[in-house]
C-alpha cells in the first residue's frame, strides 16, 4: 500500500500546491495516521496527505445528475475542446510582437473573453485525471488493514461531490449568455384569483406579496409600493411594487405565473366549512425599462379619473384622485389609486404602462429568436400553474423542476428557502439553455 500511495502522490499534479512537510511523511507515519480510529480528530488537524489532496479533487459519481449529464455530452466536450485550443493559440500569438496594434487589441479582447472558460475547463480536466488515479489507487487497497483508509476516502468523497458540482455549475453559468434584462429593476404585480368564497385567494395573495417584500429586504433591494387594494379579513385583491437593486429581474423572472394554494381557511366565510379549499393567485414580473427604452406618445393615451375605492381615508370617495390610463394602440389598461395626489397616481400608472409595453417588446424579441424557455412562465405563459402551496401537508412544490420544500411558514418568510428554490430554477434554466444549444449543434452537424 505504501509503495502504490507514494507513486500516486509524486505523480499527482495537485502535489505542487501541497506543503512539502506533507510530502515527506514516512511510510510508517502515514500508516499510523491513516489507521487512526478517531478520524474526526484527524480531520480537524488537517495534516493528512490524502486529505489535502482529496480537498483539491472532484468526484464524478454523486454530483448533480443534470449538470453531470450535460458535461458528459459529446457536443459540449467538443465545444469546450475547441474553445480551449483557441485560447492556447491566442496565448501563443500574444507572446509575439508581429501583429499590428489593431489586431493585437482584438486578440486581447478575445483572449480575455475565453480566459475564464479555459481556466474552469482546464481545472476540470486536471481534477478528473486526479480522480481516475485516485480510483485506481483505491482498487489496490484490498487488505484488511487498509479497510479504514477506504472508509476515510468514502467520507471525503462527500466533500468532493460538492466541489465538482460547483465547478460544473460555474462552467455552465459562464457558457449561458446573460439576458440584457437581467440587471433591470422590476414591477411585481399580484392579483387574487376566484374560488368559492374568495377569502382563501385574497388571504393567499397577501401572504405571497408579503413574501416577496421580505425577499427584497433579504436581498437588500429597495421595495417601493405602487398600488395596494385590500380585501376583507386582511386579504388583498391586487398590489404592485417596484423592486430595484442588483440583478432583480434575473432572480424574479421565473416567479411569474399562477400560484395555487390548498388549505383549510382560518378566517372569512370559507372557514365555516372546515374543509380543504383550493384557490389561486397570479404573479406578474415586468422588467422596468429606462426612459429611452419605451416612449409613450401622449396622443396614444386616454386618461380617466375617478374616486378612489378602499377602506378609510379622507381622500377616499371625496376627490377624483384615482387615475386610469388606456393605451389606445394596444388596449392596455392601468389603474392607480395609491396616492392622494392625482398627479402622482398618473406618474405611477404611466410607469406601470411603460413596463407592460416593454414586456411586449421582450416577448416579441424572444419569439423572433426562438429561444424562449419552458421555465419562463413569468414572461411567456402567465396562465400556467408554476407552484402549489399545500398547507395541510406543509409542502411547497414547484412543478417545473419537481422541487419540494417542507415547512411552508419558513418558505413564506421569503428568505433562505425561497432563495434556494430561485437558485435551483436559475440553474435548471441554464442547463436547459445548454441542452438546446447542444441539440442545435448536433442538428447542424447532421
Swiss-Prot record:
Location of N5-methylglutamine modifications: 314
Keyword Cell inner membrane carried by entry: no
Keywords: Methylation, Mitochondrion, Protein biosynthesis, Transit peptide
Motif (GGQ): 312-314
Region of interest: GGQ domain: 298-362
A cellular component annotation (GO) from this entry: mitochondrion
Post-translational changes noted in the entry: Methylation of glutamine in the GGQ triplet by HEMK1 is conserved from bacteria to mammals.
Function text: Mitochondrial peptide chain release factor that directs the termination of translation in response to the peptide chain non-canonical stop codons AGG and AGA. Non-canonical termination codons AGG and AGA are found at the end of MT-CO1/COX1 and MT-ND6/ND6 open reading frames, respectively.
Family matches, as PANTHER family: LD18447P, PEPTIDE CHAIN RELEASE FACTOR 1, MITOCHONDRIAL
Family of the protein in this entry: Belongs to the prokaryotic/mitochondrial release factor family.
Name recorded for this polypeptide: Peptide chain release factor 1, mitochondrial
Organism: Mus musculus
Gene that produces this protein: Mtrf1
